[in-house]
């Protein structure tokens, strides 16, 4: 038995295919979803989506949003998403280093919050690459 997974951003469909299992980062922690999972709606945190296709695991960096799970259908609506295999490792590492530097230089509450969010997004992209290596 499989699940139909659809990952959408405002600009595109990132994934629309059958999967065996997913592990999703939510605002309350990670959840695993197998076929016949109880219906839920949840907020999606900035984090990694792990997707199992048979014996192979893929990763995707998700940048926060919402998910609806029910009747073996998973719909994830996020601000942005990238497959781990599509992320350039060098560019992701450079972005992470820049985000860390920007956080150190941040002045005031607003700049600190924005720098922390940028750092979380950058770390998630690097984690998505490292999870598939």
From Swiss-Prot:
Q: Where in the cell is it found?
A: Plastid, Chloroplast thylakoid membrane
The record gives the membrane topology as:
Peripheral membrane protein
Q: Name one GO cellular component term.
A: proton-transporting ATP synthase complex
InterPro entries, per the entry: ATP_synth_F1_dsu/esu (IPR001469), ATP_synth_F1_dsu/esu_N (IPR020546), ATP_synth_F1_esu_C (IPR020547), ATPsynth_dsu/esu_N (IPR036771)
List the Pfam families.
Answer: ATP-synt_DE, ATP-synt_DE_N
Q: Name one GO molecular function term.
A: proton-transporting ATP synthase activity, rotational mechanism
Q: Which domain of life is it from?
A: Eukaryota
Keywords recorded for this protein, A-Z: ATP synthesis, CF(1), Chloroplast, Hydrogen ion transport, Ion transport, Membrane, Plastid, Thylakoid, Transport
CDD domains annotated for this entry? F1-ATPase_delta (cd12152)
Spell out the family assignment given in the record's similarity comment.
Belongs to the ATPase epsilon chain family.
Q: How does it assemble?
A: F-type ATPases have 2 components, CF(1) - the catalytic core - and CF(0) - the membrane proton channel. CF(1) has five subunits: alpha(3), beta(3), gamma(1), delta(1), epsilon(1). CF(0) has three main subunits: a, b and c.
Could you tell me what this protein is called?
A: ATP synthase epsilon chain, chloroplastic
Give the source species. Eucalyptus globulus subsp. globulus
Upper lineage ranks? Eukaryota, Viridiplantae, Streptophyta, Embryophyta, Tracheophyta
